[in-house]
């Protein structure tokens, strides 16, 4: 009798598209920079889903082109040379491309070349929303941005501020770390816990497995999973070792993180967080196979310019240090510590999951089934 596949092999087969997606999912929108970081006429290189991309703001509008000359493949951003507002010239042989459509319009070293007008760099759709620059890597016409951000992110009266940093782990470890309700133990000593007097247990003892998640997959809308562990479990505030109390959670005055959800292509929404009037939206943007851009934003509903200005000051003066760094630095440590275990893909079959991981399992399944394409290494 032939050897039967193990439970781990059968399980990972269900997630096979997710496991293949080391470089992320194609045909989706991703934030790559804050809008304020792309100044007029100042090209900025980024890497997204393994592709080198060059951004520039021309006449107020941001464009994105392939950061590689068609001639000999050198990286344009290694030495940026722009001799006109609307073009960039390769520093090696002077091939000159337009920012808006990537078209090769001149060659400084051979003005009569037959290649002029016949070639073009790859371009990428760009949208600027809520102070972020989103880039679409894919084929054909892009889907509406609203389908690739969590519900509520684009609400007209919601002000958004954020920051980003590079993390040395695959994007999926970032997504699963953020969506892992059972990992709150690592935050027990965070300055946010006492500094903002929040309620933070050590973990959760799950109830009925069938009530722990809810998925949203309607056509034309964002697709994601809600973690209902907080609603259908018993919070653990006292950690026991061999029958004796060892550590304790924090019973503060502020209840936060009531609703936690994750959405394609890899963005978490925690509401409210880190304060009852705030919502955290954070992306795990694939850079390459072993790193991701951790794009953290906080949103607040504001009804006046004064309120918007006050939130902006509060974001920079309080929440960056107390929450985005003071709390989430623990998450970065966990992701980078997991990376070696999953780098060669063996971790997906060797991991041993437990009851609170139900939401992660649902996320893997939803992402495998509803992504719009897998980015392959080029």
UniProtKB/Swiss-Prot annotation:
What general EC class does the enzyme of this chain belong to? oxidoreductase
**Gene3D superfamilies on file:** 2.20.25.10, 2.20.25.680, Naphthalene 1,2-dioxygenase Alpha Subunit, Chain A, domain 1
Q: Which GO terms describe its biological process?
A: carbazole catabolic process
User: Which keywords are on file for this protein?
Assistant: 2Fe-2S, Dioxygenase, Iron, Iron-sulfur, Metal-binding, NAD, NADP, Oxidoreductase
* Bound cofactor: record note: Binds 1 [2Fe-2S] cluster per subunit.
Q: Which InterPro entries match?
A: Cholesterol_7-desaturase, Homotrim_ring_OHase_catalytic, Rieske_2Fe-2S, Rieske_2Fe-2S_sf
What EC number(s) does the entry state?
Answer: 1.14.12.22
Q: Which SUPFAM superfamilies match?
A: Bet v1-like, ISP domain
Q: Which cofactor does it need?
A: [2Fe-2S] cluster
Catalytic reaction annotation: 9H-carbazole + NADH + O2 + H(+) = 2'-aminobiphenyl-2,3-diol + NAD(+); 9H-carbazole + NADPH + O2 + H(+) = 2'-aminobiphenyl-2,3-diol + NADP(+)
Q: What PANTHER family does this protein's entry cite?
A: BLR4922 PROTEIN, IRON-SULFUR DOMAIN CONTAINING PROTEIN
Q: How does it assemble?
A: Homotrimer. Carbazole 1,9a-dioxygenase complex consists of a terminal oxygenase component CarAa, a ferredoxin reductase component fdr and a ferredoxin component CarAc.
Q: What does this protein do?
A: Part of the multicomponent carbazole 1,9a-dioxygenase (CARDO), that converts carbazole (CAR) into 2-aminobiphenyl-2,3-diol.
What protein name applies here?
Answer: Carbazole 1,9a-dioxygenase, terminal oxygenase component CarAa
């Amino acid at each position: 009798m032939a050897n039967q596949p193990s439970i781990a092999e059968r399980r990972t087969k269900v997630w096979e598209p997710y496991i293949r997606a080391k470089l992320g999912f194609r045909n989706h929108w991703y934030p790559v920079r804050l809008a304020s970081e792309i100044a007029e006429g100042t090209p900025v290189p980024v890497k997204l889903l393994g592709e080198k991309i060059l951004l520039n703001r021309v006449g107020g509008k941001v464009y994105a082109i392939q950061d590689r000359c068609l001639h000999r493949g050198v990286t344009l951003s290694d030495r940026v040379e722009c001799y006109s507002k609307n073009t960039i010239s390769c520093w090696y042989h002077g091939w000159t491309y337009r920012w808006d459509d990537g078209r090769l319009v001149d060659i400084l070293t051979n003005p009569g070349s037959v290649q002029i007008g016949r070639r073009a760099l790859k371009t990428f759709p760009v949208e600027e929303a809520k102070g972020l620059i989103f880039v679409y890597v894919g084929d054909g016409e892009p889907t509406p941005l609203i389908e690739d951000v969590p519900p509520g992110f684009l609400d007209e009266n919601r002000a958004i501020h954020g920051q980003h940093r590079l993390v040395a782990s695959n994007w999926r470890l970032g997504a699963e770390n953020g969506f892992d309700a059972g990992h709150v133990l690592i935050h027990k000593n965070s300055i946010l816990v006492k500094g903002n007097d929040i309620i933070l247990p050590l973990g959760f003892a799950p109830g009925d497995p069938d009530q722990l998640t809810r998925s949203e997959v309607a056509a034309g809308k964002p697709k994601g999973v809600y973690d209902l562990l907080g609603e259908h479990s018993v919070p653990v505030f006292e950690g026991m070792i061999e029958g004796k109390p060892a550590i304790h959670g924090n019973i503060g005055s502020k209840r936060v993180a009531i609703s936690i959800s994750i959405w394609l292509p890899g963005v978490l929404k925690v509401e409210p967080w880190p304060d009852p009037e705030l919502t955290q939206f954070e992306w795990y943007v694939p850079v390459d196979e072993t790193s991701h851009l951790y794009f953290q934003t906080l949103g607040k509903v504001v009804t006046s310019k004064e309120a918007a200005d006050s939130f902006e000051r509060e974001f920079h003066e309080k929440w960056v240090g107390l929450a985005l760094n003071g709390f989430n630095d623990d998450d970065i440590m966990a992701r980078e510590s997991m990376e070696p275990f999953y780098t060669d893909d063996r971790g997906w079959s060797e991991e041993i999951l437990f009851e609170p991981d139900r939401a992660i399992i649902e996320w893997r399944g939803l992402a495998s089934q509803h992504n719009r394409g897998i980015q392959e290494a080029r």
